[in-house]
Amino acid sequence: MPKWHWPIDPDAVPRILVEPPGPRALEVVRRDGEVIMQSFSRWYPLVVARGYGPVVEDVDGNLYIDYNAGIAVANVGHAHPKVVEAIKRQAELFLHYSLTDFYYEVAVKLAERLIAIAPISGRKKVFFTNSGTESIEGVLKIARGYFKGQRPYVIAFLGAFHGRTYGSMSLTASKPVHRRHFSPMVPNVIHAPFPHPVHCPFKAETPEECGEYALAFLEDWIFRRLVDPSEVALVLMEPVQGEGGYVVPPRNFVQGLRKMTYEHGILFAVDEVQTGFGRTGRWFAVEHFGVEPDLIATAKAIAAGLPLGAIIGRAEVMSLPRGAHANTFGGNPVAAAAALASLEVIEEEGLLNHAETLGEELKKLFRDEVGHRHDVRGLGLMIGIELLEGKKPAKYLEDVLLKAFKRGVAVIGAGLSTVRIAPPLVIPRDMAFKAAEIILDVLRGH
């Protein structure tokens, strides 16, 4: 069970002293608009001053239950003392010395730890990055490089989100705004249908049947009519689609997809940027499906909030020649120290089991209360409530999120109409249920 390490009473949260956004928050928002490029959307004007585990405090003194973990980053909570101490110790030694030009032990230790937990058999190697999108760019480059340019095609999925830099953006297909005005994309990327449990692109009766149709589409239409599988280097998927709406594919689809890649000699990579490091009750979400990937892309929760990512893969595949791929900051020593401490916290405090158990309880609560109207899905503490009007996405997601925020729950959305629930894994059960009841009360108003 997670421990409480922070100097506030968890029973006193949420606490709204000033109706949000308060005057100090509004002033920061005003200044932000004057100096920061507004190429992204904020869900509501939450201006964070401090974090306490699964709680954030705004600049006006309001306390919120953090139901998004900084977009699934703060798995061990905000300012976990073990992580903070590790950062301090490393910062007193040295802050930077480029790993791709020199050596330091803390990065080696982290690579060894990642190799130990990665669900890939045999020898593995790691490449460190600075973010999720950079990890995806690296996976794309590694896969094409492995085949020496002889397999130029890559298959991704409709509904996927892999990032906003050019390679990852070309693989992304969750919202048109991510790609509009930026063509041409990186060439030779093909998007295949993904088996959505509610919005199946085929006339399927069950998620499993939808999965079978999606596999058949790959074989019968893409491989027989569009591109020969011998020209495909990589199939990339999210074990749970994140920005696409917290969509969990059926097990038969993932297993069939892995079998297909084996048969055609195609590399199989999973984007675990949002799902990794305990979020779904496993170290990696792909473990739920009983398959092994060739490559895993990670970032977000790996270093408890510091910018770090990692690609973990079979040693044979992680074989680009010297000089072919490098960066300046990947594997930064302070971020690596934070990551090692974060992985220790996940293990020592039993956060994998806590995420799985609490996630099942929350899903049951949501299904019992609103499952007759909305679709509740997810793995562990990665839960989506897709708001529906009949079978169509509802149009009041933003109103639900804003009302929850004003009542002290910092929850965000995904997809077209999905409430995205991804609290820090250290959240106590009572606090998680308190936030859930607030969200349910807001939903009852619709």
Residue spans for each PLM region:
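Conserved N-terminal phosphate-binding loop of PLP-dependent enzymes in the Aspartate aminotransferase
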Residues: 2-446
